[in-house]
C-alpha cells in the first residue's frame, strides 16, 4: 500500500481539512469502510484479469477535486472505461497494450445533501444512499479487461464549476440502462471544469426550488461559475391556480435568473429534449407552450439558450421511427440480468442517446460563444444531429446497478 495523506490542520473538522491522496493500485488496498475512509467499494479487489465494473471510494468533504488516474497495466493488455460517482463518463473505452500506461486528469465535484448545519436538500427516497449524495468520491472502471494503476486526489479551488439543474433527462441516472446527457457531458470537459449535476427525476422548476436544490447550488457557487437549466417535461403536468407555461413556469425561471445572477453566476437555459412521438415520420410536439415560454423569458432577460428541443427533433427524425428506439430505453425482456419484462420508454435515453445529446449540448454552448467552452477536450468535435454517431459502434459497459423501474416524471 502506497498512500500519502496530508492534513493541513489536523485539529480542524473534516470539512475544513485539505487532503491529498495517492493510491498505488498495483499493491494491495483494503475494502472500503468508514474506519479506513478509502478502498474498493461494492466489489472485491480486482485480483483476476478481466474483472469488470470495479469501484474505489474515498471519504472526502463536499467540493471539487483534481483527480489524476493512470490506466493500464505492466502485466497485461487492458481495455478500460472510466466513470465517476453515478456513472459520469470520464474516459471512453480505451485499449492499451501490455506495459502501456496512460494518465488522465479531470476535476470531479462531490456533494452531500447538507447546505448548512440546519438546512439540507430534500432528497427523495430513491436518492438516499446514491453515489451522488453520499460522503464519498467514487471512481468506477469497467471494460473487457480494465485496469487502473494509480489514483491521485487533491482538493481543487481553481476550476470553474458548471451546475446542472433539471429533471430525468439531465440527472446522473444511478442505474443502467437509463442515462442522461448530464452524466455524459463530463466526457468533454478538461480539468479546468467541474460538472455538478443537481438535477433529479420528476422535478419541475418549482419543485427544484421548493426542495432547496437551488439553495445547495448557490451555497457551492463562486462568482463566474455557470448554472444550466433544462425544465419543461414535468412542468406541463402541474395543475392548480397559476399553473401553465406563461405564469408559474415563467415566474420560476425568473427566480433562477435573479438568484443565480445575484450570487455572481452565469445562467444558461436549454429547451427540453423531445419525446419520441412520431406521426408520418415526423416528431410531434408534446411540450405545448413550455419551450416558447422558456425562450421568451430568455429573450427578455438576455439569457443564452441551447436548443436541445430542435436538435433532438432532428436527431430522432434522422434515425427514423425504428432506429430512434436505439437512443432510448427500449429493450426486450431478458436483455439485462433480472429483467423479466420489456422496457419501452419514449422519454428517457440510454447511454448512447445520452452521449449524443451531450454532444449536442456542448456544440450548442460552443455555437453561443460561452467562454467555458475554451476548456473542451482536444478531441472534441462539433456535432450535427442530422449526422449522428452510429449506435452500432457506441461502446458502454453496464454497471453493476440495474433498475427496470422508469424514472419519476415519465
Where do the protein language model's features map onto the residues?
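Short beta-strands within extracellular/lumenal beta-sheet-rich domains
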Residues: 48-63
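Sec-dependent N-terminal signal peptides
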Residues: 4-15
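Short, surface-exposed beta-strand/strand-loop-strand elements in extracellular ectodomains
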Residues: 56-57, 71-92
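Serine-esterase "nucleophile elbow" of acetyl-processing enzymes
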Residues: 139, 143-200, 214-227
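Low-complexity, Gly/Ser/Thr/Pro- and Asn/Asp-enriched, turn/coil-prone segments
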Residues: 19-51, 145-152, 168-171
Amino acid at each position: 500500500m502506497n498512500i500519502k495523506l496530508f492534513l493541513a490542520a489536523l485539529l480542524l473538522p473534516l470539512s475544513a481539512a485539505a487532503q491529498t491522496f495517492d493510491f498505488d493500485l498495483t499493491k494491495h488496498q483494503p475494502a472500503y469502510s468508514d474506519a479506513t475512509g478509502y478502498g474498493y467499494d461494492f466489489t472485491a479487489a480486482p485480483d483476476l484479469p478481466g474483472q469488470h465494473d470495479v469501484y474505489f471510494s474515498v471519504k472526502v468533504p463536499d467540493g471539487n477535486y483534481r483527480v489524476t488516474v493512470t490506466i493500464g497495466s505492466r502485466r497485461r493488455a487492458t481495455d478500460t472505461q472510466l466513470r465517476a460517482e453515478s456513472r459520469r463518463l470520464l474516459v471512453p473505452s480505451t485499449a492499451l497494450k501490455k506495459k502501456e500506461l496512460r494518465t488522465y486528469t479531470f476535476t470531479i465535484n462531490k456533494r452531500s445533501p447538507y447546505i448548512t448545519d440546519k438546512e439540507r436538500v430534500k432528497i427523495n427516497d430513491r436518492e438516499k444512499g446514491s453515489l451522488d449524495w453520499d460522503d464519498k468520491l467514487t471512481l468506477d472502471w469497467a471494460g473487457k479487461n480494465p485496469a487502473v494503476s494509480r489514483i491521485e486526489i487533491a482538493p481543487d479551488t481553481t476550476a470553474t464549476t458548471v451546475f446542472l439543474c433539471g429533471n430525468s433527462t439531465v440527472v446522473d441516472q444511478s442505474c443502467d440502462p437509463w442515462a442522461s446527457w448530464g452524466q455524459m457531458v463530463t466526457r468533454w470537459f478538461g480539468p479546468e471544469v467541474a460538472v455538478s449535476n443537481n438535477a433529479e427525476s420528476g422535478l419541475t422548476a418549482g419543485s427544484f426550488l421548493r426542495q432547496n436544490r437551488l439553495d445547495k447550488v448557490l451555497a457551492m457557487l463562486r462568482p463566474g461559475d455557470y448554472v444550466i437549466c433544462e425544465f419543461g417535461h414535468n412542468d406541463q403536468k402541474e395543475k392548480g391556480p397559476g399553473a401553465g407555461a406563461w405564469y408559474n413556469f415563467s415566474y420560476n425561471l425568473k427566480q433562477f435568473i435573479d438568484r443565480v445572477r445575484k450570487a455572481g453566476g452565469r445562467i444558461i437555459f436549454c429547451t427540453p429534449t423531445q419525446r419520441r412521438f412520431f406521426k408520418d415520420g415526423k416528431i410531434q410536439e408534446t411540450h405545448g407552450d413550455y419551450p416558447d415560454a422558456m425562450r421568451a423569458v430568455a429573450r427578455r432577460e438576455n439569457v443564452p439558450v441551447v436548443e436541445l428541443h430542435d436538435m433532438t427533433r432532428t436527431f430522432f427524425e434522422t434515425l427514423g421511427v425504428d432506429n430512434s428506439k436505439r437512443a432510448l430505453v427500449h429493450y426486450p425482456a431478458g436483455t439485462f440480468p433480472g429483467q423479466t419484462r420489456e422496457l419501452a420508454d419514449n422519454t428517457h435515453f440510454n447511454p448512447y442517446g445520452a452521449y449524443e445529446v451531450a454532444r449536442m449540448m456542448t456544440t450548442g454552448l460552443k455555437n453561443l460563444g460561452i467562454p467555458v467552452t475554451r476548456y473542451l477536450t482536444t478531441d472534441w468535435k462539433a456535432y450535427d444531429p442530422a449526422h449522428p454517431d452510429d449506435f452500432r459502434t457506441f461502446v458502454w459497459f453496464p454497471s453493476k446497478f440495474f433498475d427496470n423501474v422508469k424514472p419519476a416524471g415519465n
